[in-house]
Amino acid sequence: GLGIYRQAIMRNPTEPIWNEDGTFYENFAVNYYYNPVGIIREQDGKYNSENTRMTGNITFEPIKNWQTNLMLSRRVTSDHNRGYYTSEYFSQKSENHTGYAYHSQNEYTTDNLEVTSKYNHTWNKHRFDALVGYNYQYNVNEGFGANNYDYPTDFYLWNNLGLGTALKDGKAGMSSYKNDNTLIGFFGRVSYGYDNKYNVLLSVRREGSSKFGANQKWGYFPAASLAWEMMEMGFMKNTRKVLTSLKPRVSFGITGRSDFDAYKSLSTYNTNGSYLFDGRWVTG
């Protein structure tokens, strides 16, 4: 790695910082050693990250113990990265470039809608809770990046990318991207408790994601659990000064995952790949 601290620790303390001609002393042949002073002084950059979250809730209770809630939210995460390496930076000297600048920005937005309706009722030693809901989530990820090199001056840093002559030679880099996906869920949960001792929970969720293939977008995810609060039993009375809760639980459930890139289930085209045409491989 090129970390400044790592390079400083690796450095032979008897080696000079500067050559006699005023350039930085480098010793690339030994353990990929780079001058840490040069790394500090011959590059500049800025990185900013912002995270914004907005949430709104509306709850109403048409009848006693029955509540319905509407929740809307948006979360936006963005980062802005830019930097510049002078012609004295080790990578620029080794590649015979006079300055390198880059600029990139990325933004990830999540819009979420959730509607839930729950009911609870308690009588004698019994407790009953039920909940049904719907969730809609839309995600968008987009960004761009550009870089250029061979600058006549270091004055502008990353603030004038077009000044580098690599752009005129068709060697500058530029890229952008955007992808989106949708996640929808219907869910329900029922809970029953008796005398604060025994609790049963049953739930099911039907969820669909645009990331999956045409015939595999939806799935069912059931779950069940049984719990026993032993501290409410008479034979545990003498331990209540030491223990406040002892609740064995057994549970079973099926979960899913969609933490992979969008469009993996689709056949896509690009201009950089190769394909077989008329008995030979063609790029395009």
Regions picked out by a protein language model, each given a short descriptive name:
Residues 57, 61, 67-71, 127-131, ...:
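Membrane-spanning beta-strand positions in outer-membrane beta-barrel proteins
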